[in-house]
Amino acid sequence: MILVTLFCICALVTSLQADARLSKRYVIGGCPSHCDKSMCPTMPKDCSTGQVMDHCNCCLVCASGEGEACGGVGKLGDPVCGESLECSVTGGVSYSATVRRRGKQGVCVCKSSDPVCGSDGVSYRDICELKRVSNRAQSLQQPPVLFIQRGACGTSLHDNPNSLRYKYNFIADVVEKIAPAVVHIELYRKMVYSKREMAVASGSGFVVSDDGLIVTNAHVVANKNRVKVELKNGASYDAKIKDVDEKADIALIKIDLPNKLPVLLLGRSADLRPGEFVVAIGSPFSLQNTVTTGIVSTTQRGGKELGLRNSDMDYIQTDAIINYGNSGGPLVNLDGEVIGINTLKVTAGISFAIPSDKIRQFLAESYDRLARGRGTTKKRYIGVRMMTLTPSLSKELKGRLRDFPDITSGAYVIEVISKTPAAAGGLKEHDVIISINGQRISTATDVSAIIKKESSLRVVVRRGNEDIILTIIPMEIDP
């Protein structure tokens, strides 16, 4: 009896296997251990929805389109949804291995219901409609329609508030907020052998009052003939230097214009923590409103650590890139508050800013000086343009000027401005200043330094082959 039963079971299994081979399909039991392409169903000639691999990753089948059947019992050749579609069983349940084992079929639905824009300039209901049109075009030997933008054609990021870019683009929000109050500063000097002006340096600054007060670095505006400020809208204005703290490297300049300006507010640098995001904005290499970002590396980097012997200030260290021309621009936190002035770069990834608490102190002291009528210390002025005499310049001048003296150092006088102390004292063009008040002069900077300190100058100049003594009394002017 047992032998008869075993024989019947074997016969039944053999019969089922034969039926499976005849139908070129595997029955319930899942995918085969080895892919036999001969068992795959025949691919129809017209497959407008595209071709995909079946669940067993063995047979290439014609993809089911939106609304068409998908899934099944997990056999070779079971219908599979096309690109951008997913198989959904009734009630929105996605097709899975568990559903497959239960032998349920589903319907292909689009993974996304959001509108999209195609390369043909047409807005589509969803990505699936675009793919369907693209496949149809390709079947007609036409170019495919490419998916180029989420959202309908002509829409922007603000039309899709659920976008991750819209939600987390906080750096761009900060820049948009602060950029109108950041200015580009150009410094001009007259050329050596003509009265034409040329730009010799540039920097950045930011507006702190709507009537045109601008904060920048002292070194940006120091020793320049003319300071010009360019706003974000391209308008340019000459600026006056109102106050300077050379030790702290902070300067206050002002432009006069009829309209009110957007301003930046100061944050509290004392509240900064290492690791906070910061944004540096300025005009490196005269490229306006260039933005770099980084974090606060440390909030208290001593000036003496940086080799600044006369500095008792702590600097903010950041890895936000600060380049030439960024100097004077703001370093801001994510609230758009200024927490420092971009000041110097040591190397890539190591830059420093003057803390905003120091700026606040400078502005308070400056206000106090202006309120008392003292303002900035008057600048001593003699009315001369000069440059440092070097051996190469001396050689060049000897070739041009027949009576130029045999001298290779000093301050060479390029121009004496009429009706100034220098003109009244007898200084002339092509003179070489070699000493003032008994101090030897080697550079033009030496002359400027003495003028700042002395109210009367006993100047020795070399003119031709003679040394001539002149007395010049500097006048005081607003800087």
From Swiss-Prot:
GO cellular component: collagen-containing extracellular matrix; cytosol; extracellular region
Domain PDZ: 364-466
Subcellular location: Secreted; Cytoplasm, Cytosol
Annotated ranges, domain IGFBP N-terminal: 27-111
Active site residues of this protein: 219, 249, 327
Region (Serine protease) residue spans: 203-363
EC number: 3.4.21.-
Main location: secreted
Signal peptide: 1-18
Enzyme class: hydrolase
Positions bearing the site annotation: Involved in trimer stabilization: 168, 170, 277
Domain Kazal-like, chain residue ranges per copy: 96-155
A Pfam family matched in the record: Kazal_2
UniProt cross-references to PROSITE patterns, sorted A to Z: IGFBP_N_2, KAZAL_2, PDZ
CDD domains, per the entry: cpPDZ_HtrA-like, KAZAL_FS
BP GO annotations: positive regulation of apoptotic process; programmed cell death; proteolysis; regulation of fibroblast growth factor receptor signaling pathway
Disulfide cross-links: 31-56, 35-58, 40-59, 47-62, 70-87, 81-108
GO molecular function terms noted in the UniProt entry: growth factor binding; serine-type endopeptidase activity
Alphabetical keyword list: Cytoplasm, Disulfide bond, Growth factor binding, Hydrolase, Protease, Secreted, Serine protease, Signal
SUPFAM superfamilies according to UniProt: Growth factor receptor domain, Kazal-type serine protease inhibitors, PDZ domain-like, Trypsin-like serine proteases
Description of how the protein assembles with itself and partners: Forms homotrimers. In the presence of substrate, may form higher-order multimers in a PDZ-independent manner.
Function: Serine protease with a variety of targets, including extracellular matrix proteins and proteoglycans. Through cleavage of proteoglycans, may release soluble FGF-glycosaminoglycan complexes that promote the range and intensity of FGF signals in the extracellular space. Regulates the availability of insulin-like growth factors (IGFs) by cleaving IGF-binding proteins. Inhibits signaling mediated by TGF-beta family members. Consequently, may regulate many physiological processes. Intracellularly, degrades TSC2, leading to the activation of TSC2 downstream targets.
Family to which this protein belongs: Belongs to the peptidase S1C family.
Name by which UniProt lists this protein: Serine protease HTRA1A
Designated gene of the protein: htra1a
